[in-house]
């Protein structure tokens, strides 16, 4: 997990 991602509304690595 990187941080909270608003694009998928989950804790992941979205958009680097």
From Swiss-Prot:
Tissue spec: Expressed by the venom duct.
Swiss-Prot/TrEMBL keywords: Disulfide bond, Secreted, Toxin
Domain remark from Swiss-Prot or TrEMBL: The cysteine framework is III (CC-C-C-CC).
Highest taxon listed in the record's lineage: Eukaryota
GO molecular function: toxin activity
UniProt keyword annotation of Transcription present: no
Native species: Conus araneosus (Cobweb cone)
Annotated Gene Ontology cellular component terms: extracellular region
Disulfide bonds: 1-13, 2-11, 7-14
Family: Belongs to the conotoxin M superfamily.
Protein name: Conotoxin ar3b
NADP listed as a keyword: no
Coiled coil region boundaries: none
TM annotation in the entry: none
